[in-house]
Amino acid sequence: GQGSRLGYEGPKGKFPVGPVSGKSLFQVHAEKVLKYSRKYGVDMPLLIMTSRANHEETEAFFRDNGRFGLAPENVLIFPQNMIPSIDTKGKLILETKSSVFKNPDGHGGSLTALFTSGALAEMKKRGIETISYFQVDNPLVKIVDPAFIGFHVLRNADVSSKAVKKAYPEEKVGVFVRFSSGAIGVVEYSDLPEEKTRSLDEKGELSYSSGSIAIHLFRRE
């Protein structure tokens, strides 16, 4: 994503977060991948989803910095897909008289982009079975968590997620919910009705208290 929310012009991953080192978010994550690759004796790839606005700049940043020690084949940068935009009345927004305005399809589109970009096929070819997913603006994320991965594998899960308890009802974080179909998913805080945001269970705790921190494991298949 773009770094506008951080007051930074350019890809969010280029934002410097090291108070002394000045390392960028991209460098922090790349060095973690390199460290764990050496620790476990494997070639662990770093996959980065970009948008049209920052794809080329992201590629150039990694290239100009020697991919922070990672081999070229272990840095896979792919663009997310674009979808038509609509206004509040559900009507298509035009970019020009003959073209529809489009926007990136968001975090959820990462799974589709992994497929359409050929990244999933590359992972299958390399025997990679588990995908560790996190947001670029989380420098503290434990990208390789043995306990989390072990639990995911033991349960033979398709998806595993980490959650944190909400600090207060209005905290701006998506929450895990169980839909009427029985499926579990994440509802953004902006989409959760106010009465459900403040709803309490029989113990007096928030009914929707499990906040999503966008750390997931996916089984490749």
Report residues per predicted region:
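Domain-scale recognition of functional cores that engage charged ligands
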Residues: 5-220
